[in-house]
């Protein structure tokens, strides 16, 4: 699970909201609930009252365990199905690529020459490309959060840390495959000499410490819809960084990003198969879950990104990715359109009244998003230049 930017976050879209609890702001002075008669606090005093390691942005009050308990039996009944349809999507470790396959070999006599060649190729890449590539890598490196998120889901979590269930095996093995992505990009960026590794490492630590806010409610229906969307977003974003690396003449980096994109495509296939099976077993519950996630909008895993300086870091990163065409609002709409078609939403029958409403909402949402994006693009002005600590505070246009 990689970049998954939220191109909608910084644009004035007014999608329908779901009936959810209000937002709790953890880093804003609002959370203090001070009476109007209370004396104003200085910024240092407000900072001192914040809990350590709280996210840099507002986090929704969480809804917990929203799936009816009886539906846990659905996932227990899918154990054999998961073994035959999920675990077969995994690659044998001995046949899998490893980061070292794409990097200079430190044990070889030609190591220094190989590093020199890598750095020469990296010099041809512009700063804005590095901003997006670093953002990709940071998001990949927050993998502990994503495994944690999957293990919040009722009925499929790894209950022991080494559970033999098909669901638990999938989560651990998926994590193991994903772990190579951040490792590879991290080492490439380190060797490139183009970035401030300490600032990047701080950002990773902040992000893992902050967690993520996907609003999946311990509900595997919501969770697997979320991962289906995100894996496709990852496939698109890494595919675009591969294409642009090739355009800039770095064929080795293009191979790196393309290889990661291929992994994400395979993972997308697995997660979309789960939801497809849920539509077969429980079309009413699944279509309502899909509509619920889209009403809430898909929050991106790295949306709590922070480097210790810029609390708008994720929004700025998203703006650069949008401008470069790495991941855009159009991609968001394309993913939704793809999933609506993949899961045959229009042809669902026998739904309840609420299920029919969810179906109608989903079938009309992609055109609406496209119209809103077109209006936003028509109003869009050229963005300012802002410094990014990841590239030694060099400025990049948003």
From Swiss-Prot:
Catalytic activity entry: octadecanoyl-[ACP] + 2 reduced [2Fe-2S]-[ferredoxin] + O2 + 2 H(+) = (9Z)-octadecenoyl-[ACP] + 2 oxidized [2Fe-2S]-[ferredoxin] + 2 H2O
Keywords tagged on the record: Chloroplast, Fatty acid biosynthesis, Fatty acid metabolism, Iron, Lipid biosynthesis, Lipid metabolism, Metal-binding, Oxidoreductase, Plastid, Transit peptide
Pfam family membership, one: FA_desaturase_2
Positions of Fe cation 1 binding: 140, 178, 181, 264
Cofactor(s) needed for function: Fe(2+)
Family, similarity comment: Belongs to the fatty acid desaturase type 2 family.
Protein name, entry field: Stearoyl-[acyl-carrier-protein] 9-desaturase, chloroplastic
């Amino acid at each position: 699970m990689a970049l998954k930017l939220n191109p909608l976050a910084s644009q004035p879209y007014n999608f329908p909201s779901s009936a959810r609890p209000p937002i709790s702001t953890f880093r804003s002075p609002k959370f203090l609930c001070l009476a109007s008669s209370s004396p104003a606090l200085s910024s240092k005093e407000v900072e001192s009252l914040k809990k350590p390691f709280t996210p840099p942005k507002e986090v929704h009050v969480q809804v917990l365990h929203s799936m009816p308990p009886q539906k846990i039996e659905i996932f227990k009944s899918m154990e054999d199905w998961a073994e035959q349809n999920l675990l077969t999507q995994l690659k044998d470790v001995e046949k899998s690529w490893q980061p070292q396959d794409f990097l200079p070999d430190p044990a070889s006599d030609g190591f220094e020459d190989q590093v020199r060649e890598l750095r020469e190729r990296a010099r041809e890449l512009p700063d804005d490309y590095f901003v997006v590539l670093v953002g990709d890598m940071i998001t990949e490196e927050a993998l502990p959060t994503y495994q944690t998120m999957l293990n919040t889901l009722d009925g499929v979590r790894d209950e022991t840390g080494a559970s033999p269930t098909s669901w638990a095996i999938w989560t651990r093995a998926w994590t193991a495959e994903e772990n190579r992505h951040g490792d590879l990009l991290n080492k490439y960026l380190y060797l490139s000499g183009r970035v401030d590794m300490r600032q990047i490492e701080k950002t990773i630590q902040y992000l893992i410490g902050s967690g993520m806010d996907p609003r999946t409610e311990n509900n595997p229906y919501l969770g697997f819809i979320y991962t289906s969307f995100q894996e496709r977003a990852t496939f698109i974003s890494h595919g675009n960084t591969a294409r642009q690396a090739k355009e800039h003449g770095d064929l080795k980096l293009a191979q790196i990003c393309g290889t990661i994109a291929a992994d994400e495509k395979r993972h997308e296939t697995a997660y979309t198969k789960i939801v497809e099976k849920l539509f077969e077993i429980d079309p009413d519950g699944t279509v309502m879950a899909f509509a619920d996630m889209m009403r809430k909008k898909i929050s991106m895993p790295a949306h709590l990104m922070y480097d210790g300086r810029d609390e708008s870091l994720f929004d700025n990163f998203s703006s650069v990715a949008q401008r470069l065409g790495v991941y855009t609002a159009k991609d968001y709409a394309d993913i939704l359109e793809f999933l609506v078609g993949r899961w045959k939403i229009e042809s669902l029958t026998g739904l309840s009244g609420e299920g029919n409403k969810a179906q109608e909402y989903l079938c009309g949402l992609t055109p609406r998003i496209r119209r809103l994006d077109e209006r936003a693009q028509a109003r869009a002005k050229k963005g300012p230049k802002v410094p990014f600590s990841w590239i030694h505070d060099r400025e990049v246009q948003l």
